[in-house]
Regions:
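Membrane-spanning alpha-helical segments of multipass transporters and channels
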Residues: 50-53, 231-446
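Extracytoplasmic/periplasmic domains immediately adjacent to an N-terminal transmembrane anchor
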Residues: 1-233
């Protein structure tokens, strides 16, 4: 029997055999069309990601840094001739007027903050500015006292505070803000030093009695990071690890769809399930699947030592890993990943039903790139075209995660609301997407 089947088999031919002429033409056409579509898609979608970083340096002024002079402006240290504050303000104005690339320095009056440096700290924590340079009320008074009273314990770094909050966006801080602030600080010290020495030479007879640190550098900066980005193992939880959240949500469909399909396939032993109830089952089972998948996804962060039991900290004090919800932070973290996975996964499932395979992989690439571009990078530094990124799921997930893990300024209510809107819209579209899939299957298109 096998020998007979082999005798009847059509013999294979070479690639350029005339018998394959029509097949070759069809294959070449389909190959060219598919590759062209892929090339156009790659050009278009990757341009979204590259465009997010295009001309970022020219938009650095969007990163606001307040410079507030309290020197000699409070009752305890009031003076008519402060030195430190005016010198810093003068150098700030030079930075603002400079054609060189720099952050968005803004000179603010102390009265705007009720002459209270702690109010400035609160404003930075509340994300009204990325950083603040505060010239302390006693900056000039302490410096002069060190020279007249020969105070050997004088600390130059007590003159000026630099307030940051790197957990807000570590990439932006480390790439742009901190390097520019370092240049600013060096410029202030280089400018103030000669001016101060000249002042001492004119008004002081015995320079040798002055503490060395009061001569040089005379003033300095204390950097206060309200919410440091630490430990390093937390980075995947708010960056690359979230890409896997999208991918896991996407592959929920091809793994579970064959299981769901058994309910609507009639057989001699069982009738098909009614379509409305089948859709309800699919939505509910997907939510349950996301529940368990997000739990094990969250367990990875717990297993590798990301803190989830630290107490919250006051907004204006520096604190590492000040978990916003104390010992309940892991549960909130898990719930956010659950809701986030649903917000990311349901659109994937809808598009998988509408587009079918392999074209649904296009949507996965688009979904990953647009979410990563607007979730991992500062939208403020991108073109106004990218403002839609504020409404994209991953941007909201990242923002809420930073609140849970580091205790940054909370907008977690808005973050969850946006994610629930994504889920609601996706579920509303779910029946239509399912109808399109079944319509295509009946015609053999899927």
């Amino acid at each position: 029997m096998f020998e007979k089947a082999e005798d009847q088999a059509v013999p294979a031919v070479s690639f350029f055999d005339p018998a394959l002429k029509e097949v070759r033409r069809r294959v070449f056409y389909q190959w060219s069309r598919t590759v062209s579509i892929l090339c156009i898609f790659v050009l278009g979608v990757l341009s979204i990601f590259w465009g997010m970083q295009y001309s970022t340096e020219s938009k650095l002024t969007e990163l606001k840094v307040w410079v507030v002079d309290f020197d000699g402006q409070t009752d305890d240290y009031r003076t008519s001739s402060p030195l430190v504050g005016p010198a810093v303000i003068k150098k700030t104005q030079e930075f603002i007027n400079s054609p060189d690339l720099h952050l968005g320095y803004i000179i603010k009056n102390a009265s705007t903050f009720d002459n209270d440096p702690w109010v400035v700290r609160q404003a930075v924590y509340d994300e009204h500015a990325y950083a603040a340079v505060i010239i302390n009320p006693n900056a000039t008074s302490l410096l002069r006292a060190a020279t007249t009273q020969h105070n050997a314990s004088y600390d130059p770094t007590g003159a000026i505070q630099t307030i940051t909050i790197t957990a807000r966006d570590q990439n932006t801080y480390y790439s742009y803000i901190l390097p520019d602030l370092s240049l600013f600080q060096s410029a202030v010290l280089a400018s103030f030093g000669p001016q101060w020495v000249q002042n001492l030479i004119t008004n002081t007879k015995n320079l040798t009695a002055i503490p060395p640190q009061a001569l040089n550098p005379a003033i300095g900066f204390t950097t206060i990071d309200l919410r440091p980005f630490t430990p390093a193992v937390a980075a995947p939880a708010v960056t690359i690890g979230l890409i896997y959240l999208i991918i896991i949500a996407f592959f929920n469909f091809p793994f579970l769809m064959p299981i769901h399909a058994q309910l609507i396939k009639p057989s001699p032993s069982n009738p098909p399930l009614k379509i409305p109830q089948w859709l309800i089952w699919r939505v509910c089972s997907n939510i349950a699947a996301y529940f368990f998948l997000s739990f094990f996804y969250s367990l990875v962060s717990l297993a590798f030592g990301i803190p989830f039991t630290n107490s919250p900290a006051p907004d204006t004090l520096s604190a590492e890993n000040a978990n916003a919800y104390g010992r309940g932070s892991f549960v909130v973290f898990w719930m956010l990943n659950w809701v986030g996975m649903a917000a990311l996964g349901f659109p994937c499932e809808n598009m998988a039903m509408v587009l079918g395979f392999p074209w649904s992989s296009f949507f996965l690439i688009f979904w990953v790139i647009t979410n990563v571009a607007t979730g991992f990078y500062a939208v403020e530094l991108a073109s106004v075209f990218y403002r839609w990124g504020y409404a994209w799921p991953l941007h909201r997930i990242v923002e809420a995660l930073r609140t849970i893990l580091f205790g940054t300024h909370s907008r977690i209510g808005v973050d969850f609301a946006v994610l629930f809107i994504w889920i609601a819209v996706s579920i509303a579209f779910f029946p239509a997407a399912s109808s399109i899939m079944r319509w295509k299957m009946k015609r053999g298109w899927a």
